[in-house]
């Protein structure tokens, strides 16, 4: 299994719609102002956060249960900047829609710009033949409120291609998050 380069990422995005919308290079400025970068890097793709958020609140629930998650545990927010309360978290989604090839698995890691501020981005791997908008989780590990910027980079996706195509893909087994569009809560 080998990591894929910028040339491969560009080719797969432009010819096969693997990433839409797609930035073929690194974008570091918008409208003359510096931003958290996004787009193609040497061996990955820096994804952007959309302006749809679900901010965790503990006023409506007493326990967090991934098998029986209460939607009232979140407050919906739409905007260019999301403020995450201290020691809390928020969910968001990517601006990019992904179509992962059958021979590819991705790993997604948070950007150091956020990590250096105590904001951890968590995303599970994108499995072979998964497609959809990615649900992102931002944890604010600090005792202060923290900002997340919509339309800017937040994590990097690394693409790994196997020497052998998998027997059963995410699509084949009817994965529960296949084709997700909005910020998607836990499912069982």
UniProtKB/Swiss-Prot annotation:
EC number: 3.5.4.13
UniProt gene name: dcd
Pathway membership, UniProt: Pyrimidine metabolism; dUMP biosynthesis; dUMP from dCTP (dUTP route): step 1/2
Keyword line: Hydrolase, Nucleotide metabolism, Nucleotide-binding
SUPFAM superfamilies found in the cross-reference section: dUTPase-like
A GO biological-process term: nucleobase-containing small molecule interconversion
Pfam family, one: DCD
Subunit structure: Homotrimer.
Primary role: Catalyzes the deamination of dCTP to dUTP.
Protein name: dCTP deaminase
Glycosyltransferase as UniProt keyword: no
Catalysis performed (reactions): dCTP + H2O + H(+) = dUTP + NH4(+)
Residues at the active site: 137 (proton donor/acceptor)
Family the entry assigns: Belongs to the dCTP deaminase family.
Top-level taxonomy: Bacteria, Pseudomonadati, Pseudomonadota, Betaproteobacteria, Burkholderiales
GO MF: dCTP deaminase activity; nucleotide binding
UniProt binding sites for dCTP: 111-116, 135-137, 156, 170, 180
Organism: Cupriavidus necator (strain ATCC 17699 / DSM 428 / KCTC 22496 / NCIMB 10442 / H16 / Stanier 337)
CDD domains, per database record: trimeric_dUTPase
């Amino acid at each position: 299994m080998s990591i894929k380069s910028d040339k491969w990422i560009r080719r797969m995005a432009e010819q096969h719609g693997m990433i839409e919308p797609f930035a073929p290079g690194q974008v570091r400025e918008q409208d003359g102002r510096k931003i958290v970068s996004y787009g193609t890097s040497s061996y990955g793709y820096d994804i952007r956060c959309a302006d749809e958020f679900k901010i965790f609140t503990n006023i409506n629930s007493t326990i967090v249960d991934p098998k029986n998650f209460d939607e009232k545990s979140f407050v919906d927010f739409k905007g260019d900047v999301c403020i995450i309360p201290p020691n809390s978290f928020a969910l968001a989604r990517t601006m990019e829609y992904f179509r992962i090839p059958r021979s590819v698995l991705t790993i997604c890691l948070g950007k150091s710009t956020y990590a250096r501020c105590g904001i951890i981005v968590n995303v599970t791997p994108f499995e072979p033949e998964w497609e959809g908008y990615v649900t992102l989780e931002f944890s604010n590990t600090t005792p202060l409120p923290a900002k997340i910027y919509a339309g800017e980079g937040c994590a990097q996706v690394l693409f790994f291609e196997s020497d052998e195509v998998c027997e059963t893909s995410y699509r084949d087994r009817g994965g529960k998050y296949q084709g997700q569009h909005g910020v998607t809560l836990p499912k069982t």
